[in-house]
Regions:
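Sec-dependent N-terminal signal peptides of Gram-positive bacterial secreted proteins and lipoproteins
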Residues: 7-22
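Positively charged n-region of N-terminal signal peptides that target proteins for export
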Residues: 1-7
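OB-fold and OB-like single-stranded nucleic-acid-recognition modules
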Residues: 21-175
Length: 175
């Protein structure tokens, strides 16, 4: 009976411990095994990550809206990421805010690891997402007469390093 009572008390205290630990965490380091899940969690619960340091490796990617405004992002490619309703591959990451030079995207539409890779440290600018209206594509990869809205959080970059040896990084991430 005492063992059962101790287990019950432990189970009741576990959520408090988890909440207490996660609220006090000041930084997140996304790596190959955590990138997709943590990035997805950030997209759903951005308020939990504002003012927390986030470190991650990504490649640069331009998103152009229907008015030809460009957004330079730091992303990874994934299947059915946050906000994806099409069931096709998409990208997950942030719009980058940085005072210095950011490498131009390289092979962003190609299924290759040969990209413009960067190592970033920074924080979410806010929990507000930027809505970007983009052209939709048909099954053949041609621009259709439809548009769709994608949403990205903005990331204030405090440190950026170019990654020259990206052999241990995967442009495509999943669960």
């Amino acid at each position: 009976m005492i063992k059962m009572k101790n287990k019950l008390i432990s189970l009741m205290l576990l959520p408090l411990l988890v909440v207490g630990c996660s609220n006090g965490q000041k930084s997140y380091v996304l790596n190959e095994s955590t990138f997709f899940l943590v990035m997805t969690n950030i997209q759903y619960y951005p308020e939990e990550y504002v003012n927390k340091d986030i470190t991650y490796d990504c490649f640069t990617y331009n998103i152009k809206d229907v008015n030809n405004k460009e957004y330079l992002c730091g992303v990874r490619k994934c299947t059915a990421g946050f906000g994806c309703r099409c069931g096709k591959d998409t990208v997950i990451g942030f719009i980058l805010n940085y005072e210095g030079d950011i490498p131009e995207p390289k092979n962003q539409y190609e299924d290759t690891n040969d990209k413009a890779w960067i190592h970033l440290v920074g924080q979410l600018a806010s929990e507000t997402k930027t809505k970007i209206e983009i052209n939709s594509y048909d099954a053949n990869g041609n621009i259709s007469d439809q548009t769709e809205i994608v949403e990205f959080l903005s990331f204030n970059v405090s440190s950026l390093e170019t990654i020259t040896d990206y052999s241990n990084l995967a442009y495509f991430v999943s669960k």
